[in-house]
Design a protein with these regions (language model features):
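Residue-identity detector for glycine
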Residues: 5, 17, 33, 44, ...
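Composition- and surface-driven signal marking solvent-exposed, interaction-prone regions
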Residues: 19, 62, 127-130
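Active-site acidic catalytic loop and adjacent metal/ATP-binding pocket
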Residues: 1-39
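Intrinsically disordered or highly flexible coil/loop and linker segments, enriched in small
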Residues: 12-13, 56, 146
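ATP/Mg2+ or Mg2+-diphosphate-binding catalytic cores
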Residues: 77-158
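Active-site activation/catalytic loop segments of kinase-like enzymes and analogous catalytic loops
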Residues: 25, 31-91, 108-123
């Protein structure tokens, strides 16, 4: 399997002017040669877009913090939600429940790795990205508690 290194929605170019679905998209800006190369890293990065809404947060101009509340406009996309579900179903079918769990854990790691950069370079909006990290961590915890990653649970849903 080829490793991209920065597989985000923004790095997938879709074309509507071609009939062959295999040629309707291509990937740009590879970042190969990382110390840790794994398709799980790539899929985790993709989920940072589809699940965590990273690109939508990048377009959100401001957030406010009052006591223990972080307020910002949380943008969701039905198309992203559908793609997120399709990627999770596809990866779960190919990698098993433990593989899907690992991919979602890698998404969380991408959010964790992002925080020092946001705290240094984007201090005013860093709380919003922290909130994104917490939302993803909460989802992962909920799915673990619901048994989403148990092999039998995934098999029963098919």
């Amino acid at each position: 399997a080829d490793i991209h290194g920065d597989l985000t929605v923004e790095n997938i170019i879709c074309r509507t002017d071609v009939e062959n679905p295999d040629k309707a998209w291509y990937i740009i800006d590879p970042n190969t040669g990382n110390l840790h190369d794994s398709p799980y890293l790539d899929y985790g990065k993709l989920l940072q877009s589809l699940h965590g809404g990273y690109e939508f947060m990048m377009m959100t101009p401001r957030c406010t913090v009052q006591e223990n509340h972080i307020d910002f406009q949380l943008t969701r996309s039905a198309a992203y939600d559908t793609l997120f579900e399709a990627v999770c179903d596809g990866r779960g079918a190919r990698c098993g429940s433990s593989g899907l769990h690992s991919i979602l854990a890698h998404e969380l790691i991408h959010w964790l790795r992002l925080m020092p950069y946001k705290l240094n370079k984007d201090k005013k909006r860093a709380p919003m990205f922290y909130a994104g990290l917490v939302m993803v961590a909460n989802d992962l915890n909920t799915w673990e508690n619901e048994g989403k990653f148990d092999e039998k649970a995934r098999t029963d849903r098919r």
